[in-house]
């Protein structure tokens, strides 16, 4: 759900504009916003349907893998499409991304095993991962300077409606027609987005300078993180430890090439911003991704109710974004600290969902606090990060921020999934397993509040 808000959350205060857009620019703007809306609906709806999918296909042990593989494929696609866009322009990479996304929807919709769902999710992640950096590039290249802040606002607004209705729609569709239709219903939007965007994109060629390729590093980083996440699911302790070590050995050096130097110690400036994004995504989504599972397995809630529980956080996330857009004078360090504090408070507020006697409406309200915190910190981190981008290198910085989101989400998704799998085959209860994940997320929020002090604009 919320992992995809990070993609399009750069909203800044706007001055009245006088530049008129031509027909091609207007068509492109509508198409880009529709593309964001499509991705937002997919992310939010699938998160709601996933407990039902794993239940029907007996795939609890792959719950975390289904979350993480989407993000890992996203990671590679971010780098690949960013480089292809710099070299060849945005049209062909964007069309290829839409095609891969469509293939992923079809694979998941027809899947008879959880392994095929995981493959479909990986293809979906690869497709949507290509859309985000291209959208940022096009805002810079296709629209006048005085229109760019408003375009970021429109892209962000593309998340509002899906955040409100996708969980409920996905739950209702799953209840009455089956979870496969959650994937099928998105397919008709893809050709519409393609028709509206691809042709106008051909007018905007590359303006950036060619850099050394980072694709190999992205592949190794994804392979390492995938090995790490998969190893966490192994029953054999020795195999799990070996897999974790192998994953870290392959993944960490590659991530160091992809992320700003000094991100591991939250060095002042861009590294601290990227570190905060990674910690925020890990802390928030490490809880948000498992609330529907808790509602399903602990409270025996229907898919509709599972989706409803996380709507509050989605709405408050958007509200927090727009609040920061209207108050750009707030120091980003203060805003990010407030954001992490709200995330931590929200985690404490939803911890009782692990008890079967706790009312789910209280979880709805409690997790809205965490969503507000995410809204407070995402605009300042995005705007501050982009202030460090040199002309022609906006895509590089944008991809680094998005990579941080991917790393944070996939890591906590893998750890949380491992806890769920462990509860299946040991005496550890599911509430206990999720409680460990929630506690780790709370600790990461606290660490993020400390790192926020190193944030600085260029």
Language-model-detected regions and their locations in the chain:
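A helix-boundary/kink motif common to multi-pass secondary transporters
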Residues: 58-59, 89-90, 113, 144, ...
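Extracellular/periplasmic helix-loop-helix junction of adjacent transmembrane segments
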Residues: 49-75
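12-transmembrane solute porter fold
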Residues: 25-41, 46-48, 67-69, 79-80, ...
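Hydrophobic alpha-helical transmembrane and interfacial-helix anchor sites in secondary transporters
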Residues: 53, 84, 173, 326-327, ...
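Cytosolic juxtamembrane N-terminal segment immediately preceding the first transmembrane helix
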Residues: 2-41
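Paired intracellular helix-loop junctions of major facilitator superfamily
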Residues: 59, 139-149, 385-394
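Hydrophobic transmembrane-helix bundles of small-molecule transporters
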Residues: 175-284, 288
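Helix-loop-helix hairpins in multi-pass membrane proteins, especially solute transporters
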Residues: 75, 81-211
């Amino acid at each position: 759900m919320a992992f995809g808000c990070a993609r399009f959350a750069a909203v800044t205060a706007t001055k009245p504009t006088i530049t008129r857009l031509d027909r091609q620019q207007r068509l492109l703007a509508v198409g880009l916003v529709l593309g964001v809306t499509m991705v937002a609906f997919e992310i939010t709806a699938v998160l709601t349907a996933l407990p039902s999918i794993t239940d029907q296909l007996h795939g609890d042990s792959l719950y975390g893998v289904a979350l993480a593989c989407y993000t890992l494929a996203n990671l590679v696609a971010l780098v690949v499409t960013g480089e292809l866009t710099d070299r060849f322009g945005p049209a062909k990479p964007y069309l290829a991304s839409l095609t891969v996304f469509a293939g992923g929807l079809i694979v998941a919709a027809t899947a008879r095993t959880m392994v095929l769902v995981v493959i479909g999710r990986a293809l979906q992640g690869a497709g949507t991962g290509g859309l985000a950096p291209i959208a940022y590039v096009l805002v810079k290249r296709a629209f006048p300077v005085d229109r760019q802040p408003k375009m970021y606002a429109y892209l962000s607004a593309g998340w509002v409606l899906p955040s409100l209705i996708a969980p409920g729609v996905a739950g209702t569709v799953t209840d009455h027609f089956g979870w496969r239709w959650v994937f099928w219903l998105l397919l008709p939007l893809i050709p519409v987005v393609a028709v509206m965007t691809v042709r106008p994109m051909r007018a905007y060629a590359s303006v950036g300078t060619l850099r050394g390729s980072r694709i190999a590093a992205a592949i190794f980083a994804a392979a390492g993180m995938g090995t790490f996440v998969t190893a966490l699911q192994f029953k054999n302790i020795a195999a799990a430890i070996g897999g974790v070590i192998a994953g870290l050995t392959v993944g960490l050096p590659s991530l160091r090439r992809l992320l700003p130097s000094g991100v591991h110690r939250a060095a002042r400036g861009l590294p601290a911003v990227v570190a905060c994004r990674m910690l925020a995504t890990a802390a928030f989504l490490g809880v948000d991704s498992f609330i529907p599972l808790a509602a399903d397995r602990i409270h025996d809630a229907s898919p509709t109710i599972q989706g409803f529980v996380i709507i509050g956080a989605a709405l408050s996330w958007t509200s927090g974004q727009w609040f920061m857009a209207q108050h750009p004078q707030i120091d980003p360090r203060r805003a990010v600290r407030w954001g992490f504090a709200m995330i931590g408070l929200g985690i404490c507020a939803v911890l009782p969902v692990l008890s079967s006697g706790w009312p789910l409406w209280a979880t709805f309200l409690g997790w809205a606090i965490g969503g507000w915190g995410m809204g407070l910190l995402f605009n300042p981190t995005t705007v501050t990060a982009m202030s460090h981008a040199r002309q022609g290198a906006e895509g590089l910085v944008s991809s680094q921020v998005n990579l941080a989101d991917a790393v944070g989400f996939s890591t906590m998704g893998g750890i949380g999934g491992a806890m769920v799998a462990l509860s299946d085959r040991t005496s550890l209860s599911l509430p206990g397993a999720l409680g460990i994940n929630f506690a780790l997320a709370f600790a990461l929020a606290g660490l993020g509040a400390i790192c926020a002090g190193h944030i600085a604009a260029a």
